[in-house]
Amino acid sequence: MGIEEYGGGQGPHSDVLVVTTNDVPGYRVQHVIGEVFGLTVRSRHLGSQIGAGLKSMIGGELKGLTKTLVETRNQAMERLVEQARVRGGNGILMMRFDVTEAADVGTEVCAYGTAVVLVKA
């Protein structure tokens, strides 16, 4: 798998800055908009599940599941950023992911944080 298949995060020219911290050095929070989140639920692919079961017996990375989870997290992030953008934010503080099982048929990934308006300090 190439780097683009198992990584994620923001591009260098995003108009909404997403951080996992309470603040951003060199900026101050002008306005707190509030909580925003991006959510997606992915069903389990039978082929990946069978492959994962076999792979778990011999060990090693479950590449099919890794790729699916990366795509899922990236989609949740895109939705999170869009929510902040449409509410007038240019930053998201304290971004986190929450991953849970969804009714035994899939995986729910939620990216969440606090949308804010940031200005240079």
Swiss-Prot record:
Q: What is this protein called?
A: UPF0145 protein SAV_4658
Q: Which family does it belong to?
A: Belongs to the UPF0145 family.
* Any Pfam family matching the protein: YbjQ_1
The species this protein was found in: Streptomyces avermitilis (strain ATCC 31267 / DSM 46492 / JCM 5070 / NBRC 14893 / NCIMB 12804 / NRRL 8165 / MA-4680)
Query: Which PANTHER family did the record assign?
Result: UPF0145 PROTEIN SCO3412, UPF0145 PROTEIN YBJQ
Record InterPro entries: UPF0145_dom_sf (IPR035439), UPF0145_YbjQ-like (IPR002765)
Q: Which SUPFAM superfamilies match?
A: YbjQ-like
